[in-house]
Amino acid sequence: MPKTIAFKHDTVLLHETVDMLEVKPNGIYVDATLGGAGHSEYLLSKLTTGHLYSFDQDETAHANAKVRLSEQLAEDKVTLIKSNFRNLKSALAELDITKIDGILYDLGVSSPQFDDSQRGFSYKKEARLDMRMDQSQTLSAYEVVNDYPYEALVRIFFRYGEDKFSKQIARKIEQSRKIKPIETTIELADLIKSALPQKELKKKGHPAKRIFQAIRIEVNDELGAAEESIEQAIDLLKVDGRISVITFHSLEDRLTKSIFKEYSTVNVPKGLPMLPKEMEAKLKLINRKPVLASEEELEFNNRAHSAKLRVAQKQRD
């Protein structure tokens, strides 16, 4: 049985993310990233006859939500969906939901997944290399580290970790795994350190952070899934419906910003006196600059330091 005690989780940008959706009490809403259920719980407090659909592929998140949201589940105000959010449209269609009033995303790995040492997400805690958000999938960090060719590792480390020492780290991994498989998080973290110049080790922040991020993104296809899901969400939104997206690193933020820009920009032909409705932008940006955590939140929630919130509103189908 999945543990619920593991899900001690301080929800980032809780009020901002939900409040900016301008929740209608009778609306249909989606929490694409259930996690610790903080956003879901707060959004549910704003619903009367409305309904919330909460997605997560992590069984532990569902076990926790069944306890935390037990009252709302009993009242049939929320439906928990165990699925990757890239299946957003098809999963909702199975429930006869084709349009929604709003949706929120809290991207990346959740704090409880980091905190559970057995999940293999953390470079600070000894565990078998894993990093799977969905424990039923076959590809894990172990396979990426031990089976991917040198060139693929370099590409992943550079693209998803933006690490300038990608080649050196990939070469060190390649040499080490010829002797014996790299099995644990600490083993990998120590290997990464050994590949770096001494001056890099003295810099602020853990030297393995970027590489662990890159492997995690590869294992879970995080950016591919996010892009697919956000585009599906825009299509699902009713006119005037809103989408809130919290990101935690530059790759997620650039992706979100790029999608929002694509859907909120119109190239108007010269000499056109009036823009036809079908040529209007699908989205309107609610905030051009991302919303950041307040000083008050930063005092008790360290994870909020890198959080950025972007919100947009549907203008036309």
UniProtKB/Swiss-Prot annotation:
Gene name in the database record: rsmH
Molecular-function GO terms, alphabetical: rRNA (cytosine-N4-)-methyltransferase activity
Protein name per UniProt: Ribosomal RNA small subunit methyltransferase H
InterPro entries linked to this entry: RsmH (IPR002903), SAM-dep_MeTrfase_MraW_recog (IPR023397), SAM-dependent_MTases_sf (IPR029063)
Species lineage: Bacteria, Bacillati, Bacillota, Bacilli, Lactobacillales
Sequence positions that bind S-adenosyl-L-methionine: 37-39, 56, 85, 106, 113
Keywords: Cytoplasm, Methyltransferase, rRNA processing, S-adenosyl-L-methionine, Transferase
Signal peptide residues on this chain, from the entry's feature table: none
Chief site of localization: cytoplasm
